[in-house]
């Protein structure tokens, strides 16, 4: 395993561990659909089972969401070879693999995703989400930064991309 893959693997494992740990702790200590206010009128821990994706879209389409997750992981794996090898990109790919895998595990084993981060911003109750979702969003933002900086082009990468 080359150095690039080791760094991404470490970030992936740490992310996946934190995702599953936080979900398990919330499930163990907070009743389903109960809300524990942490910062008044701003942030609560609210444990819910999400049978869909973001904003509960595609609710009860678990098999489809599992397939989408697996396809996403394969595409992201292939993209690893298109982007320059640097700390930011390693972190981005590790976060993406960890976040997507964390929710994939829930979908495959439980049939739903455990969500618990509940923010109210300017009286808008934002959809409840989890650490895996945060990891995916941060990973995507980091890759967008890489694209704007021109770090998405590696010389002689066409053969790796094709196979």
Question: Where does each model-flagged region fall?
Answer:
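Alpha-helical transmembrane bundles and membrane-interface segments of multipass inner-membrane proteins
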Residues: 1-163
């Amino acid at each position: 395993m080359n150095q690039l893959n080791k760094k991404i693997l470490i970030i992936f494992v740490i992310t996946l561990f934190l995702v599953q740990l936080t979900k398990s702790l919330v499930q163990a200590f907070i009743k389903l659909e109960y809300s524990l206010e942490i910062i008044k009128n701003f942030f609560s821990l609210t444990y819910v089972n999400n049978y869909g994706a973001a904003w509960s879209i595609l609710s009860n389409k678990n098999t489809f969401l599992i397939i989408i997750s697996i396809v996403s992981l394969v595409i992201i794996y292939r993209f690893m070879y298109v982007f320059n090898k640097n700390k930011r990109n390693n972190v981005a790919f590790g976060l993406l693999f960890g976040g997507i895998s964390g929710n994939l595990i829930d979908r495959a084993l439980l049939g739903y995703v455990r969500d618990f981060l509940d923010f109210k911003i300017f009286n808008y109750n934002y959809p409840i989400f989890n650490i895996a979702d945060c990891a995916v969003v941060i990973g995507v933002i980091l890759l967008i930064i890489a694209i704007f900086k021109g770090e998405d082009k590696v010389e002689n990468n066409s053969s790796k991309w094709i196979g």
